[in-house]
Amino acid sequence: MKPTVWHHLRLCPHGHPDETIDDAAIAVDETGTIAWLGALSALPHGYAHWQREDLHGAWVTPGLVDCHTHLVYGGTRADEFAQRLAGVSYEEIARQGGGIVSTVRATRAADETTLFVQAAARLQPLLAEGVTAIEIKSGYGLDLASERKMLRVARQLGERFPVTVYTTFLGAHALPPEYAGRADEYIDEVCDRMLPTLADEGLVDAVDVFCERIGFSLAQTERVFEAATRRGLPVKLHAEQLSNAGGTALAARYRALSADHLEFLDEAGIEAMKAAGTVAVLLPGAYYFIRETQLPPIDLLRKHGVPIALATDHNPGTSPLESLLLTLNMGCTLFRMTVPEVLQGVTRHAAAALGRADRHGALEVGRQADFAAWSVGSLAELAYWIGRPLCEQVVRGGTPVFRRMNG
């Protein structure tokens, strides 16, 4: 690529709308790295001969980060949506053999090509909203071959699309039918066979567990964390979504990158997260879709200074959401977060939730030039508009990878 100066833009380099530069420029070298940024009037003379790209006054933010998704799976769960509308709870559906296990059946039956095509269709709306990094979990295979298949598809998405994909092994997502009544034996399989094999194959960037009364116990969760730690893999946790099971405190003991959901999180768990540097990942799409009523403890998270990230939690059962911008709106309207909080929640804090704050979530000299240009009058509009296409252009590694067609 040619060294390029992107100019005539309004710059929000760290995802905070109070830290901006009007009439700014970003100089990107031939490697796709940011060589300089600041006010256009201060552009050093050494960049005068570089190619120019005029963004016509657009707002520019770091590329967005969707730090919690289940993007690869087979089938849908539209039938369960109808059940919930009729009053059947998420937990009851799971106990009846639906929920995660129904998606497991569909995912096991699908081949890699089918899973790739379906996941690619889910990914593309996110890319058109400025997402340049995404986490994708396994967890709908629940056996070695199927978990491998999911993680391979996730890796392929990162190779075939202009997005950085981080994979999370979520083998301890639910108990597969063949292990009914034998949860400890299944955890043996996860820890002794599945995790080591998939890690050795280079398919795992982090490890997650669903710690809940309809998921896995604290003791079982700790076994998975121990297995991950032995292999040098960071951990994450689905925690405190349906009850206060104490998973967050356990996650903090293992210095988890993040604890996610957190509707029933208590102050002791928050204090543990703060001490461990664990990010709180809130998932308003799931809260909305299954009509939860217990709000995450936003005020306590603020009080203790725990960084808050937001994510789509895209999945077929509780958050079939393909819009990170709608997630921003939900963070404000449902969780009563501020615009600066939600914007940082999908940039710097989302990057921290992946352990990649040094690579994503900010625009700084020496970093890869991943950014999005927005046709808005103010950054608050990113959380304000519902359903309007706002992203004009996405640049990854200094190369334009998306431009909105007008007219």
Swiss-Prot record:
Cofactor: Zn(2+); Fe(3+)
Positions annotated to bind N-formimidoyl-L-glutamate: Y140, N315, G317
EC number(s) from the headed UniProt entry: 3.5.2.7
UniProt: Fe(3+) binding residues: H68, H70, H238, D313
Residues involved in 4-imidazolone-5-propanoate binding: R77, Y140, H173, Q241, T318
Pathway(s) of this molecule: Amino-acid degradation; L-histidine degradation into L-glutamate; N-formimidoyl-L-glutamate from L-histidine: step 3/3
Reaction(s) catalysed (UniProt annotation): 4-imidazolone-5-propanoate + H2O = N-formimidoyl-L-glutamate
UniProt function note: Catalyzes the hydrolytic cleavage of the carbon-nitrogen bond in imidazolone-5-propanoate to yield N-formimidoyl-L-glutamate. It is the third step in the universal histidine degradation pathway.
Entry-linked HAMAP family: HutI
Name the UniProt record assigns to this protein: Imidazolonepropionase
